[in-house]
Swiss-Prot record:
NCBIfam families: PRK00696.1 (NF001913), sucCoAbeta (TIGR01016). Coiled coil: none annotated. The keyword Membrane does not apply. This is Succinate--CoA ligase [ADP-forming] subunit beta. It comes from the Bacteria. The gene is sucC. Succinyl-CoA synthetase functions in the citric acid cycle (TCA), coupling the hydrolysis of succinyl-CoA to the synthesis of either ATP or GTP and thus represents the only step of substrate-level phosphorylation in the TCA. The beta subunit provides nucleotide specificity of the enzyme and binds the substrate succinate, while the binding sites for coenzyme A and phosphate are found in the alpha subunit. It comes from Herpetosiphon aurantiacus (strain ATCC 23779 / DSM 785 / 114-95). Mg(2+) binds at N192, D206. ATP binds at K45, G52, R53, G54, I94, E99. Its cofactor is Mg(2+). PROSITE patterns: ATP_GRASP, SUCCINYL_COA_LIG_3. The lineage of its organism: Bacteria, Bacillati, Chloroflexota, Chloroflexia, Herpetosiphonales. Keywords: ATP-binding, Ligase, Magnesium, Metal-binding, Nucleotide-binding, Tricarboxylic acid cycle.
Amino acid sequence: MKLHEYQARDIVARYGIPVTGGGVAATAEEVQKVAEQIGGPVAVKAQVHVGGRGKAGGIKLANTPAEAFDAGKAILGMDIKGLTVEKVLVAEAITFEKEIYLGVILDRATKRVVLIASSEGGVEIEEVAKINPDAIIKLAADPLLGLQPYQAQELAYSIGITDAKQARQFSSIATGLYRAFVENDAELAEINPLVVLPNGQLQALDSKIVLDDSGLFRHSEVAGMRDIAGEPESEIKARENGLTFIKLDGNIGCMVNGAGLAMATMDVVNLFGGEPANFLDIGGGANAQKVAAALDIILDDPNVKVVMVNIFGGITRCDEVAKGIVEAQKIIKRQVPMVVRLVGTNEAEGQRILADASLTPASTLADAAQKAVDIAKQ
């Protein structure tokens, strides 16, 4: 679950991390009121779950409350990559001398919580990794002891912070961000940028937190922050139907049971020169209704030219999947070619149900991927 910037800002502030003054607003009048309370230049920032809001005109500076009103009026209601701006963060605009990146992630390769820091903040960390990977420093925290203050100070020195007082403050901020990550079951927590003020103090200018949906039952207060209106409709539909769905940029829709098989399917599609349009795991024991819902979600994407179904039936019954496919074809208006591989429990019955449907059968994963890629290229 993604949090808006203003929500992430409130969470990191609870952990002793200094943030800029400001507040959230849903109308231009509220924007002006917050700007008056700040009493100086402000930044009016669109709160949407997509990147590139600055380039889209979703961030504006204002020197007076009247200018803030105009900025709020311009941004609220704006469409940014398909999402409507319903709230803005009105934050104090400050002068700073340097930008730093600080983030916390779960590194599955090392099975550790890892802190990432860079002296090149203010830009996407992925861009820094491409252009100057040596500017990125990583530190793995011990899962039993947690992040130790001396480790955080070493991280500060590693990114060029030489002032002892500043290094101690960085250590405090890094420890706070680490705690925010662990205690809220997050997948990502980052401050970008963490800025150095003219007086040498550090302050978080922008915060981002992504929570693990599987841990939300332990955090009812945070779970209530979910902004359904700010999420893609496809992800909302998937969650309501118990599906795991991630939209990608390709044109080959994928419906698979099991996360591992879904990733393997996407890899094989890439191997044969295709581009998956999504990751979609229908899970174990999926019934016809869930399969139909999955196909409906996939076909909501206008880029999809073909759907590849790859089912290895264990708990999931192939005949139930087949029934769902046939049912979906009856009710879904948009029809595209489908390549179907069914192997496992009730396989023969599933093949019988699909015999009269306008589908392309496949016997192996490689066969299915090749056929799907060939159709997508037509």
